[in-house]
């Protein structure tokens, strides 16, 4: 049986398709490395800016030490149509107070569970993409998603800035 050839997709359409998958798939899987063992778990992003994804965490969770030892991570989004987006990136502890405050203000669950933004258990990771790939259903081939989106003919960074 011949392998199907995926139809070409324009760069602008790839960005839109990838964003749609991210919006539909509420709980991507975050992959980290624990020594020589990969670890994966579903996460609930607290904010996305284009392909930059913010994930809240508690210091006591295993991924804290894993990311401290190796900040290279991957997020995999899978929607109900089996379309996928994979974001390969680098996780860093968020230090921008304005963004942290915005995340805190917009997330009642964080406020309920942690009580205060100053709670030392709270860490928010900013995952900066270095590569974004999209796959339509089970096409068996990923498309590279451009890191720069075009809106109305003007180039904009894929992080929405």
Annotate each PLM feature.
Residues 4-27:
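Short, basic/aromatic recognition patches
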Residues 25, 70, 107:
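Acidic-histidine catalytic/liganding microenvironments
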Residues 41-44:
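Conserved beta-strand in the GNAT
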Residues 29, 52-54, 74, 86, ...:
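General beta-strand recognition
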Residues 46-82:
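A short mixed-secondary-structure module that forms the rim of ligand-binding clefts
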Residues 1-10, 84-161:
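Charged, gly/pro-rich active-site loop segments
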Residues 37:
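Phosphate-coordination/substrate-recognition cap region in phosphate-metabolizing enzymes
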Residues 20-34, 73-77:
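A short, Trp-centered hydrophobic/proline-enriched beta-strand micro-motif
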């Amino acid at each position: 049986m011949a392998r199907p050839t995926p139809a070409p997709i324009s760069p602008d359409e790839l960005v839109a398709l990838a964003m749609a998958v991210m919006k539909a798939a509420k709980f991507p899987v975050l992959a980290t490395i624990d020594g020589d063992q990969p670890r994966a778990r579903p996460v609930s992003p607290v904010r996305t800016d284009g392909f930059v994804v913010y994930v809240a965490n508690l210091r006591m969770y295993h991924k804290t030490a894993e990311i401290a030892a190796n900040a290279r991570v991957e997020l995999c989004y899978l929607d109900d149509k089996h379309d996928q987006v994979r974001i390969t990136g680098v996780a860093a502890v968020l230090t921008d107070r304005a963004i942290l405050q915005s995340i805190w203000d917009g997330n009642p669950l964080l406020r309920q569970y942690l009580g205060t933004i100053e709670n030392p258990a709270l860490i928010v990771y900013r995952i900066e993409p270095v590569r974004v790939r999209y796959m339509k259903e089970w096409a068996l081939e990923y498309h590279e998603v451009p890191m720069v989106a075009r809106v109305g003919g003007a180039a904009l960074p894929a992080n929405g800035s």
